[in-house]
Amino acid sequence: MVKAIKMKNTFSLLITIVFCCQISITHAQYTDVINSNRPGSSQSAFSVGTKVLQFELGSYLVKEKRNVYPNYEVSGYGLDFAVHYGIWKEALELNIQGTYQNDTKSYSSGVIKDETRANFKNFNIGAKYLVYDPNKNKEDKPNLYSYHANRGFKWSSLIPAVSVAGGLNFDSEDNPYTATTVDGVSYRGVLITQNNFAGGWVFVTNFMLDRIGSDQTDLNYTLTLTHSFNPKWVMFAETQGIKSDFYADNLFRFGAGYLLGKNLQLDTALTFNTKDTPSVLNISFGVSYRIDRHDTSN
């Protein structure tokens, strides 16, 4: 009963925050080419654009090794996916996100029986809303009198775009990737910021409170820095921190994306950590595709 009241109050708070942020936004960052969240794990502050349907799909190989008791190794593969659809004045986006993993957990002692595991590590249905865009109704005009002013650092770029996101998590009973008491529906809340700097640099932060109302509430932060070298290639570096009673880690990612067409991107990334309880090494490959029926009338 107490748990149900806690979940209800948390959900009401999230709804209140979203409705308090109903600011009219007429400018957003729809782009002529696809702007995927892959291959990083953070999400952009901006919607994909009104009436734009975007698919993001990746596969990865996972290797984990724990060198202290109970010693074990994990090897397997996984799939992560996301679907985004933009509606209402470019500011609101609906999305579905998830990660499915299949692996074998082998214990070196021989006393504990090896495990074959398969389930969703997470599955979420939610929405994202652009609360503040520093470039709203602003046209960045070149300085006709100063070459250095056009090429130099713009202090206004330090003010980030801000979004809030929320959603429902769905966890099944006896899921090996969650605490044993976690099942059913819980909530997610995310604060997102994004700075677009000159020279093709973008800095994104995500601060997430996940599985709110369950026995495993996760605190998660992700910091992502991307750089476009040319219209085709983008590189990124990312750090992700995870903290809960069930699992804690600090992950690092490096990767690249290649624009194969205006609506199609390929990507790859390497993920690792610096501890041995367990050590983590993942390599991923992915693709992003959008159906662009962008409508500026909404």
Kindly give the residue locations of the regions a language model identified.
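Transmembrane beta-barrel domains of Gram-negative outer membranes and organellar outer membranes
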Residues: Q29-I212, Q216-N298
